[in-house]
């Protein structure tokens, strides 16, 4: 929570974004615990509107050379935490923020594909993935909700 108090100083937003980008570049070499911690931190920052999902625009979700197993693990953890830990309104608002920006069309498409391939498909295929049926259903519902939100900036409710 300390980071939230610093974020109110607008001058620190860009250095934080650059710091996150530097960490994203190092994901393939990180230990699993550090990957998990970064995913949880990122989920908290996005959920509290400290950073936008647009911070992910530097990630080439469709490039198989950069999407190593550790990078995929990081973003699977991030999206699983973000989509299950926070309220519908928070999740919807975060995705609507990138839906209203035409320049982020490519990011929206890549996110939808990544979520479908690495989160939803895995939920459907692996009934024994260590998550409850309730959590699985919540993730499926949230995926449908955010996909709809990214496709249009009209109200989903």
Question: What feature does the model see in each segment?
Answer:
Residues 1-157:
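Alpha-helical interaction scaffolds
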